[in-house]
A protein has these predicted regions:
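A short beta-strand motif characteristic of beta-propeller blades
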Residues: 14-19, 59
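Short, intrinsically disordered, charge-balanced linker/junction segments flanking boundaries
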Residues: 1-3, 191-194
Length: 194
């Protein structure tokens, strides 16, 4: 999913992206001429103060370095898969820091609330804690999520929770399980309000 920062040029009646192929998260807080100020986070880095200027991100702070230097984090991997009816779904999974593809790990499926919300590859302390405790953490954007167009978000109208979003979530579990490192007897679900 995407929620890009865009510039609207009223004189030219044009819209352009501030960053191309941006997959992380930037919480915009202020604009000064051509410079944007905010908080920048990735799937493996908590938020830091940053600017965007001339299409480039510059991180200004290192508030989290003291804490991060004491821990090993698991790697976050993006996945794209299809539900049984052919619907394309995007998600991510985090593996434990000492991940070994030949071992079996318990799985935690994280489900977002909303339903009109979406996950992005942003840092989440709880998810990294689960991964540090030896779990694979899966989070996806099933039907009803924003960031994939209004048709994808609104397909669940009058059907939430419904078969489409459930099918998408279960297909994500199947996709990660098929990778061969999930203990199918130890799967858990954690979610937010819906």
């Amino acid at each position: 999913g995407s929620a890009n920062i865009k510039i609207l040029d009223i004189q030219r009646s044009s819209v352009s992206n501030v960053l191309n192929k941006f997959k992380d998260q930037f919480y915009l807080t202020s604009i000064n001429e051509n410079k944007l100020f905010g908080v920048y986070t990735t799937s493996s880095r908590p938020g830091e103060l940053a600017t965007i200027e001339d299409g480039k991100i510059k991180v200004l702070s290192e508030f989290n370095e003291i804490v991060l230097s004491q821990y090993s984090l698991g790697k976050t991997n993006e996945i794209n898969y299809q539900a049984p009816d052919g619907t394309d779904v995007q998600g991510w999974y985090i593996v434990p820091p000492d991940f070994d593809k030949n071992k079996k790990y318990p799985l935690v499926l994280i489900i977002h609330g909303g339903p009109h919300a979406m996950y992005r590859p942003q840092f989440n302390y709880l998810w990294h804690q689960f991964a540090s405790d030896g779990y694979v953490v899966l989070y996806t954007n099933p039907r009803g999520s924003t960031g994939y167009g209004s048709d994808f978000a609104n397909v669940i109208d009058n059907d939430y929770p419904g078969q489409g979003d459930l099918s998408d979530l279960l297909a994500g579990v199947d996709h990660v399980t098929d990778l061969g490192f999930i203990d199918e007897d130890n799967m858990y679900v954690q979610g937010c309000s819906g």
